[in-house]
């Protein structure tokens, strides 16, 4: 699968369910659900204890709105970064969500996920 050749709409169709799952799983602190689409590289750095600390220390990560707005795609090397405008159910303001997708063993996987 050549992810880089896909249109923005095709990328959105792939990325949105992954992002929605990350938001839902983060809100309920579900480690298994949160990491289910992670690449092996991401899994290595996202152990359950570390994620638990992030969820405990950052209210934003457990209060994300299920509504987001797609902002665009950035294609670089073998990865596509998908950008979202994200809000929180409890924290005022708008946040930038970043989802880095790539292909591992023929499947689209998460190689990065952050929110600022």
Show the residue positions of the predicted features.
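Structural motif
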Residues: 105-107
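Short, low-complexity N-terminal intrinsically disordered segments enriched in polar/charged residues
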Residues: 1-28
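Short, well-ordered alpha-helical segments enriched in acidic and aromatic residues
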Residues: 27-41
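A solvent-exposed, acidic/Ser-Thr-rich amphipathic alpha-helical stretch
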Residues: 40-58
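Cystatin/cathelin-like cysteine-protease inhibitor module
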Residues: 13, 109-114
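Surface-exposed, charged secondary-structure patches
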Residues: 53-103, 112-116
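Short amphipathic alpha-helical segments enriched in hydrophobics
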Residues: 26, 30, 59-62
């Amino acid at each position: 699968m050549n992810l880089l050749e896909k249109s923005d709409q095709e990328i959105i169709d792939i990325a949105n369910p992954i992002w929605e799952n990350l938001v839902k799983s983060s809100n309920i602190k579900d480690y298994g659900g949160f990491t289910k689409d992670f690449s092996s590289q991401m899994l290595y750095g996202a152990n359950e204890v570390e994620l638990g600390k992030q969820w405990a220390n950052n209210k934003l990560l457990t209060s994300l709105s299920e509504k987001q707005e797609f902002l665009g795609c950035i294609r670089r090397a073998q990865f596509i970064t998908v950008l979202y405008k994200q809000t929180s159910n409890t924290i005022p303001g708008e946040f930038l969500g970043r989802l880095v997708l790539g292909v591992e063993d023929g499947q689209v996987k998460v190689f990065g996920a952050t929110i600022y």
